[in-house]
Protein backbone atom coordinates (compact mmCIF):
# COMPACT_ATOMS: atom_id res chain seq x y z
CA UNK A 1 0.00 0.00 0.00
CA UNK A 2 1.52 3.32 -1.05
CA UNK A 3 1.62 6.61 0.83
CA UNK A 4 3.01 10.05 -0.05
CA UNK A 5 6.35 8.93 1.40
CA UNK A 6 6.76 6.21 -1.21
CA UNK A 7 5.25 7.67 -4.39
CA UNK A 8 8.66 8.50 -5.85
CA UNK A 9 10.84 5.63 -7.06
CA UNK A 10 13.06 4.28 -4.31
CA UNK A 11 16.75 5.09 -4.60
CA UNK A 12 19.91 4.23 -2.75
CA UNK A 13 21.43 7.16 -0.89
CA UNK A 14 24.20 7.75 -3.44
CA UNK A 15 21.67 7.83 -6.27
CA UNK A 16 19.61 10.38 -4.38
CA UNK A 17 22.59 12.50 -3.28
CA UNK A 18 25.47 11.85 -5.70
CA UNK A 19 27.59 14.67 -4.21
CA UNK A 20 27.36 13.39 -0.64
CA UNK A 21 30.72 12.35 0.82
CA UNK A 22 30.72 9.31 3.07
CA UNK A 23 34.19 8.48 4.32
CA UNK A 24 37.59 8.30 2.67
CA UNK A 25 37.38 5.18 0.53
CA UNK A 26 35.67 4.43 -2.81
CA UNK A 27 32.89 1.88 -3.09
CA UNK A 28 33.18 -1.37 -4.97
CA UNK A 29 31.52 -1.75 -8.41
CA UNK A 30 28.15 -2.78 -6.92
CA UNK A 31 28.54 -0.98 -3.60
CA UNK A 32 27.48 -4.17 -1.85
CA UNK A 33 28.72 -7.15 0.11
CA UNK A 34 29.01 -9.23 -3.07
CA UNK A 35 31.83 -6.95 -4.21
CA UNK A 36 33.97 -9.17 -1.99
CA UNK A 37 35.15 -11.89 -4.41
CA UNK A 38 33.39 -15.20 -3.81
CA UNK A 39 30.65 -13.91 -1.49
CA UNK A 40 27.14 -14.88 -2.62
CA UNK A 41 23.70 -13.84 -1.36
CA UNK A 42 20.03 -14.65 -1.85
CA UNK A 43 16.85 -13.12 -0.47
CA UNK A 44 13.45 -14.78 -0.02
CA UNK A 45 10.65 -12.26 0.51
CA UNK A 46 7.24 -13.31 1.85
CA UNK A 47 4.50 -10.74 1.23
CA UNK A 48 1.53 -12.67 -0.20
CA UNK A 49 -1.15 -10.48 -1.76
CA UNK A 50 -3.79 -12.62 -0.07
CA UNK A 51 -2.54 -11.88 3.45
CA UNK A 52 -0.97 -8.52 4.21
CA UNK A 53 -0.28 -9.67 7.77
CA UNK A 54 2.68 -11.65 6.45
CA UNK A 55 5.74 -9.48 5.88
CA UNK A 56 8.87 -11.51 6.49
CA UNK A 57 11.53 -13.62 4.79
CA UNK A 58 15.14 -14.67 4.99
CA UNK A 59 18.52 -13.63 3.64
CA UNK A 60 21.27 -16.16 2.90
CA UNK A 61 24.93 -15.13 2.78
CA UNK A 62 27.55 -17.63 1.61
CA UNK A 63 31.16 -16.75 2.52
CA UNK A 64 32.12 -18.68 -0.62
CA UNK A 65 30.70 -21.50 -2.72
CA UNK A 66 32.75 -24.17 -0.93
CA UNK A 67 31.58 -23.19 2.56
CA UNK A 68 30.89 -26.76 3.67
CA UNK A 69 34.38 -28.17 3.10
CA UNK A 70 36.45 -25.07 3.77
CA UNK A 71 35.93 -22.64 6.62
CA UNK A 72 36.98 -19.01 6.69
CA UNK A 73 38.25 -17.03 9.66
CA UNK A 74 35.63 -15.02 11.54
CA UNK A 75 35.18 -12.78 14.56
CA UNK A 76 32.16 -11.55 16.53
CA UNK A 77 31.24 -8.46 18.50
CA UNK A 78 28.13 -8.05 20.64
CA UNK A 79 27.18 -4.43 21.25
CA UNK A 80 23.98 -5.49 23.05
CA UNK A 81 22.89 -9.06 23.54
CA UNK A 82 19.09 -9.00 23.33
CA UNK A 83 19.16 -11.24 20.28
CA UNK A 84 20.28 -14.57 18.89
CA UNK A 85 23.04 -15.71 16.57
CA UNK A 86 23.36 -19.48 16.57
CA UNK A 87 26.78 -21.02 16.10
CA UNK A 88 28.41 -18.05 17.79
CA UNK A 89 29.98 -20.12 20.58
CA UNK A 90 31.88 -22.21 18.04
CA UNK A 91 33.02 -19.12 16.15
CA UNK A 92 34.28 -17.64 19.42
CA UNK A 93 36.00 -20.92 20.27
CA UNK A 94 37.76 -21.57 16.96
CA UNK A 95 37.57 -18.38 14.92
CA UNK A 96 36.11 -20.42 12.06
CA UNK A 97 32.93 -20.00 10.00
CA UNK A 98 31.87 -23.03 7.95
CA UNK A 99 28.17 -22.35 7.47
CA UNK A 100 25.91 -20.10 5.47
CA UNK A 101 24.82 -17.05 7.44
CA UNK A 102 21.02 -16.83 7.49
CA UNK A 103 19.16 -13.71 8.63
CA UNK A 104 15.46 -13.96 9.42
CA UNK A 105 12.81 -13.08 12.01
CA UNK A 106 12.99 -14.03 15.68
CA UNK A 107 10.45 -16.84 15.47
CA UNK A 108 12.01 -18.42 12.36
CA UNK A 109 15.42 -19.21 13.85
CA UNK A 110 14.55 -22.88 14.38
CA UNK A 111 13.22 -23.40 10.87
CA UNK A 112 16.22 -21.65 9.34
CA UNK A 113 18.59 -23.75 11.46
CA UNK A 114 16.83 -26.91 10.31
CA UNK A 115 17.01 -25.69 6.71
CA UNK A 116 20.80 -25.41 6.78
CA UNK A 117 21.07 -28.95 8.13
CA UNK A 118 18.56 -30.29 5.60
CA UNK A 119 20.67 -28.86 2.78
CA UNK A 120 23.92 -30.18 4.26
CA UNK A 121 22.48 -33.67 4.75
CA UNK A 122 21.01 -33.72 1.24
CA UNK A 123 24.37 -32.95 -0.34
CA UNK A 124 26.82 -34.51 2.11
CA UNK A 125 25.42 -37.73 3.55
CA UNK A 126 26.32 -41.19 2.33
CA UNK A 127 23.71 -43.85 2.84
CA UNK A 128 22.22 -42.08 5.81
CA UNK A 129 25.57 -41.58 7.51
CA UNK A 130 26.60 -38.17 8.78
CA UNK A 131 30.29 -38.13 9.68
CA UNK A 132 30.94 -34.40 9.62
CA UNK A 133 30.65 -31.45 12.00
CA UNK A 134 28.94 -28.15 11.20
CA UNK A 135 26.96 -25.64 13.28
CA UNK A 136 24.54 -23.39 11.34
CA UNK A 137 24.78 -19.64 11.83
CA UNK A 138 21.33 -18.03 12.01
CA UNK A 139 20.68 -14.50 13.30
CA UNK A 140 17.38 -12.72 13.90
CA UNK A 141 15.58 -9.46 14.43
CA UNK A 142 11.97 -9.00 15.55
CA UNK A 143 9.38 -8.10 12.90
CA UNK A 144 6.22 -8.63 14.97
CA UNK A 145 4.89 -5.09 14.44
CA UNK A 146 4.28 -5.73 10.73
CA UNK A 147 4.40 -9.53 10.53
CA UNK A 148 2.13 -12.15 12.10
CA UNK A 149 4.72 -14.28 13.86
CA UNK A 150 2.15 -16.84 14.98
CA UNK A 151 1.82 -18.40 11.52
CA UNK A 152 5.55 -19.27 11.19
CA UNK A 153 5.75 -18.38 7.50
CA UNK A 154 9.44 -19.17 7.00
CA UNK A 155 10.00 -22.85 6.16
CA UNK A 156 13.21 -24.93 6.22
CA UNK A 157 13.11 -25.65 2.48
CA UNK A 158 13.37 -21.92 1.77
CA UNK A 159 16.88 -21.96 3.22
CA UNK A 160 18.02 -24.72 0.89
CA UNK A 161 16.56 -22.86 -2.08
CA UNK A 162 18.40 -19.75 -0.92
CA UNK A 163 21.72 -21.58 -0.66
CA UNK A 164 21.30 -23.08 -4.12
CA UNK A 165 20.12 -19.78 -5.60
CA UNK A 166 22.77 -17.50 -4.10
CA UNK A 167 24.56 -15.25 -6.62
CA UNK A 168 27.15 -12.48 -6.81
CA UNK A 169 24.51 -9.97 -7.96
CA UNK A 170 23.75 -6.89 -5.87
CA UNK A 171 21.62 -7.97 -2.91
CA UNK A 172 18.06 -6.58 -3.19
CA UNK A 173 17.52 -3.94 -0.52
CA UNK A 174 14.72 -2.46 1.55
CA UNK A 175 11.67 -4.68 2.14
CA UNK A 176 13.47 -7.84 1.08
CA UNK A 177 14.65 -11.09 2.61
CA UNK A 178 14.95 -11.16 6.38
CA UNK A 179 14.47 -7.40 6.40
CA UNK A 180 11.00 -7.48 4.84
CA UNK A 181 9.09 -6.58 8.01
CA UNK A 182 11.70 -4.50 9.80
CA UNK A 183 11.48 -0.90 11.06
CA UNK A 184 14.54 1.35 11.36
CA UNK A 185 14.93 4.79 12.97
CA UNK A 186 11.16 5.31 12.87
CA UNK A 187 10.88 4.56 9.14
CA UNK A 188 10.38 1.38 7.17
CA UNK A 189 13.75 -0.37 7.24
CA UNK A 190 15.06 -3.76 6.24
CA UNK A 191 18.01 -5.06 4.23
CA UNK A 192 20.85 -2.80 3.13
CA UNK A 193 24.36 -3.25 1.81
CA UNK A 194 27.46 -1.26 0.90
CA UNK A 195 31.19 -1.74 0.27
CA UNK A 196 34.54 0.00 0.26
CA UNK A 197 37.82 -0.66 -1.55
CA UNK A 198 41.09 -0.11 0.32
CA UNK A 199 44.60 0.02 -1.11
CA UNK A 200 46.99 -2.58 0.29
CA UNK A 201 49.99 -4.79 -0.35
CA UNK A 202 50.50 -8.50 -0.74
CA UNK A 203 53.29 -10.42 1.02
CA UNK A 204 56.88 -9.40 0.31
CA UNK A 205 59.00 -11.55 -1.98
CA UNK A 206 62.53 -12.69 -1.25
CA UNK A 207 63.86 -9.24 -2.07
CA UNK A 208 61.44 -7.53 0.28
CA UNK A 209 59.20 -6.20 -2.49
CA UNK A 210 55.41 -6.36 -2.08
CA UNK A 211 52.94 -6.07 -4.95
CA UNK A 212 49.95 -3.71 -4.63
CA UNK A 213 46.59 -5.28 -3.86
CA UNK A 214 43.12 -3.81 -3.56
CA UNK A 215 41.09 -5.20 -0.69
CA UNK A 216 37.31 -4.98 -0.39
CA UNK A 217 35.18 -4.64 2.72
CA UNK A 218 31.49 -5.39 2.18
CA UNK A 219 28.65 -5.03 4.67
CA UNK A 220 25.08 -6.29 4.78
CA UNK A 221 22.67 -5.16 7.49
CA UNK A 222 19.26 -6.24 8.68
CA UNK A 223 18.22 -2.95 10.27
CA UNK A 224 15.35 -2.90 12.76
CA UNK A 225 16.19 -0.48 15.55
CA UNK A 226 15.98 3.11 16.73
CA UNK A 227 13.83 6.23 16.90
CA UNK A 228 13.13 8.92 14.31
CA UNK A 229 14.35 11.63 16.71
CA UNK A 230 17.88 10.18 16.59
CA UNK A 231 18.14 9.65 12.81
CA UNK A 232 21.08 11.43 11.22
CA UNK A 233 22.52 11.38 7.71
CA UNK A 234 26.17 12.40 7.44
CA UNK A 235 25.76 14.29 10.71
CA UNK A 236 22.59 16.14 9.68
CA UNK A 237 19.75 15.70 12.26
CA UNK A 238 17.28 14.60 9.60
CA UNK A 239 14.92 12.86 12.02
CA UNK A 240 14.40 15.89 14.24
CA UNK A 241 13.93 18.15 11.22
CA UNK A 242 11.26 15.83 9.80
CA UNK A 243 9.50 15.70 13.19
CA UNK A 244 9.46 19.50 13.37
CA UNK A 245 8.09 19.78 9.82
CA UNK A 246 5.35 17.26 10.59
CA UNK A 247 4.34 19.16 13.73
CA UNK A 248 4.17 22.44 11.80
CA UNK A 249 2.03 20.86 9.09
CA UNK A 250 -0.29 19.41 11.73
CA UNK A 251 -1.10 16.24 9.76
CA UNK A 252 -2.88 14.27 12.47
CA UNK A 253 -2.78 10.96 10.59
CA UNK A 254 0.97 11.16 10.01
CA UNK A 255 1.62 12.19 13.60
CA UNK A 256 -0.54 9.32 14.82
CA UNK A 257 1.43 6.80 12.76
CA UNK A 258 4.68 8.31 14.03
CA UNK A 259 3.52 8.01 17.64
CA UNK A 260 2.38 4.42 17.10
CA UNK A 261 5.74 3.35 15.69
CA UNK A 262 7.59 5.20 18.43
CA UNK A 263 5.53 3.51 21.14
CA UNK A 264 6.13 0.07 19.61
CA UNK A 265 9.87 0.71 19.47
CA UNK A 266 9.98 1.94 23.06
CA UNK A 267 8.35 -1.32 24.20
CA UNK A 268 10.58 -3.58 22.06
CA UNK A 269 13.45 -2.01 20.18
CA UNK A 270 14.10 -4.43 17.39
CA UNK A 271 17.85 -4.92 16.84
CA UNK A 272 20.37 -4.83 14.00
CA UNK A 273 22.48 -7.60 12.52
CA UNK A 274 25.64 -6.51 10.70
CA UNK A 275 27.59 -8.96 8.54
CA UNK A 276 31.00 -7.73 7.39
CA UNK A 277 33.02 -9.55 4.72
CA UNK A 278 36.50 -8.87 3.37
CA UNK A 279 39.08 -10.53 1.16
CA UNK A 280 41.89 -8.98 3.19
CA UNK A 281 43.68 -11.86 4.94
CA UNK A 282 42.74 -11.33 8.59
CA UNK A 283 42.92 -13.67 11.57
CA UNK A 284 40.05 -14.05 14.07
CA UNK A 285 41.31 -11.43 16.53
CA UNK A 286 41.62 -8.89 13.73
CA UNK A 287 38.14 -9.79 12.50
CA UNK A 288 36.68 -9.21 15.94
CA UNK A 289 38.27 -5.77 15.79
CA UNK A 290 36.73 -5.21 12.34
CA UNK A 291 33.32 -6.25 13.72
CA UNK A 292 33.65 -3.71 16.54
CA UNK A 293 33.98 -0.91 13.96
CA UNK A 294 30.41 -1.52 12.83
CA UNK A 295 29.49 0.26 16.07
CA UNK A 296 30.85 3.53 14.68
CA UNK A 297 28.70 3.29 11.57
CA UNK A 298 25.62 2.43 13.60
CA UNK A 299 26.19 5.33 16.00
CA UNK A 300 26.54 7.84 13.15
CA UNK A 301 23.05 6.95 11.92
CA UNK A 302 21.48 7.09 15.38
CA UNK A 303 21.81 3.71 17.08
CA UNK A 304 22.45 3.53 20.82
CA UNK A 305 22.26 -0.19 21.59
CA UNK A 306 19.17 0.09 23.79
CA UNK A 307 18.28 -2.52 26.40
CA UNK A 308 16.04 -4.70 24.21
CA UNK A 309 18.03 -4.25 21.00
CA UNK A 310 20.05 -7.23 19.79
CA UNK A 311 23.03 -5.60 18.09
CA UNK A 312 25.20 -8.46 16.83
CA UNK A 313 28.08 -8.07 14.38
CA UNK A 314 29.92 -10.86 12.53
CA UNK A 315 32.99 -10.29 10.36
CA UNK A 316 34.66 -12.89 8.16
CA UNK A 317 37.59 -12.98 5.76
CA UNK A 318 37.84 -15.01 2.56
CA UNK A 319 41.60 -14.43 2.46
CA UNK A 320 42.37 -17.92 3.78
CA UNK A 321 40.46 -21.18 3.42
CA UNK A 322 40.77 -23.79 6.15
CA UNK A 323 39.83 -27.44 5.42
CA UNK A 324 37.33 -28.66 8.01
CA UNK A 325 35.84 -31.85 6.57
CA UNK A 326 39.02 -33.65 5.48
CA UNK A 327 39.46 -35.99 8.40
CA UNK A 328 40.75 -39.42 7.43
CA UNK A 329 42.02 -42.54 9.16
CA UNK A 330 45.55 -41.17 8.82
CA UNK A 331 44.72 -37.96 10.71
CA UNK A 332 46.29 -37.93 14.16
CA UNK A 333 44.41 -35.42 16.36
CA UNK A 334 47.31 -35.46 18.82
CA UNK A 335 49.94 -34.49 16.25
CA UNK A 336 49.82 -30.74 15.60
CA UNK A 337 49.89 -29.89 11.88
CA UNK A 338 50.91 -26.51 10.48
CA UNK A 339 49.05 -24.68 7.70
CA UNK A 340 50.53 -21.93 5.54
CA UNK A 341 48.50 -18.72 5.50
CA UNK A 342 48.76 -14.97 4.94
CA UNK A 343 47.74 -12.34 7.48
CA UNK A 344 47.66 -8.57 7.51
CA UNK A 345 50.05 -6.62 9.71
CA UNK A 346 48.17 -4.91 12.54
CA UNK A 347 49.99 -1.65 11.97
CA UNK A 348 48.53 -1.46 8.43
CA UNK A 349 44.89 -2.18 9.32
CA UNK A 350 43.44 1.32 9.81
CA UNK A 351 42.03 1.62 6.29
CA UNK A 352 40.05 -1.58 6.83
CA UNK A 353 38.70 -0.22 10.12
CA UNK A 354 37.49 2.94 8.39
CA UNK A 355 35.98 0.93 5.54
CA UNK A 356 34.02 -1.25 7.99
CA UNK A 357 32.54 1.77 9.77
CA UNK A 358 31.72 3.69 6.59
CA UNK A 359 30.16 0.72 4.78
CA UNK A 360 28.01 -0.09 7.82
CA UNK A 361 26.75 3.48 7.94
CA UNK A 362 25.86 3.52 4.25
CA UNK A 363 24.28 0.07 4.33
CA UNK A 364 21.81 1.32 6.96
CA UNK A 365 21.01 4.38 4.83
CA UNK A 366 20.34 2.09 1.86
CA UNK A 367 18.06 -0.14 3.93
CA UNK A 368 15.97 2.91 4.85
CA UNK A 369 16.03 4.64 1.46
CA UNK A 370 15.11 1.51 -0.51
CA UNK A 371 12.29 0.39 1.79
CA UNK A 372 8.66 1.04 0.89
CA UNK A 373 5.70 2.00 3.06
CA UNK A 374 4.15 -1.16 4.46
CA UNK A 375 0.75 -1.90 5.97
CA UNK A 376 0.95 -5.17 7.85
CA UNK A 377 -0.26 -7.22 10.80
CA UNK A 378 -3.35 -5.82 12.55
CA UNK A 379 -3.33 -2.88 10.16
CA UNK A 380 -0.09 -1.46 11.49
CA UNK A 381 1.48 0.92 9.03
CA UNK A 382 5.09 2.10 8.82
CA UNK A 383 5.94 4.81 6.31
CA UNK A 384 9.01 4.83 4.14
CA UNK A 385 11.15 7.92 4.39
CA UNK A 386 10.09 10.61 1.93
CA UNK A 387 13.08 10.77 -0.41
CA UNK A 388 12.14 14.18 -1.80
CA UNK A 389 11.98 15.56 1.72
CA UNK A 390 15.29 13.89 2.60
CA UNK A 391 16.96 15.36 -0.46
CA UNK A 392 15.64 18.85 0.27
CA UNK A 393 16.92 18.70 3.84
CA UNK A 394 20.35 17.38 2.91
CA UNK A 395 20.93 19.88 0.10
CA UNK A 396 20.69 22.72 2.62
CA UNK A 397 23.72 21.30 4.42
CA UNK A 398 25.85 20.19 1.46
For the regions a language model picked out, list residue spans one by one.
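Alpha/propeptide regions of enzymes that mature by internal proteolysis
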Residues: 2-398
Amino acid sequence: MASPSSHSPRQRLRQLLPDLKLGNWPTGPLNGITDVPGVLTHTTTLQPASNRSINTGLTVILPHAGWFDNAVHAGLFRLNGAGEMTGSHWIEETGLLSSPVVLTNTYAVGDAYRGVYDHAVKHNSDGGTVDWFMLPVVAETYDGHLNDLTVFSVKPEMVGAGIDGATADLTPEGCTGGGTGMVCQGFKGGTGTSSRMVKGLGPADGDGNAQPRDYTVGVLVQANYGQIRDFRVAGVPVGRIIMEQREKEGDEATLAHQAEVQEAKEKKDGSIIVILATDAPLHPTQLKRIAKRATMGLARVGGYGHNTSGDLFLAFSTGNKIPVQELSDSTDPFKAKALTMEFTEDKTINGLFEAAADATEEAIYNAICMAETTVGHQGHRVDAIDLTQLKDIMEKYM
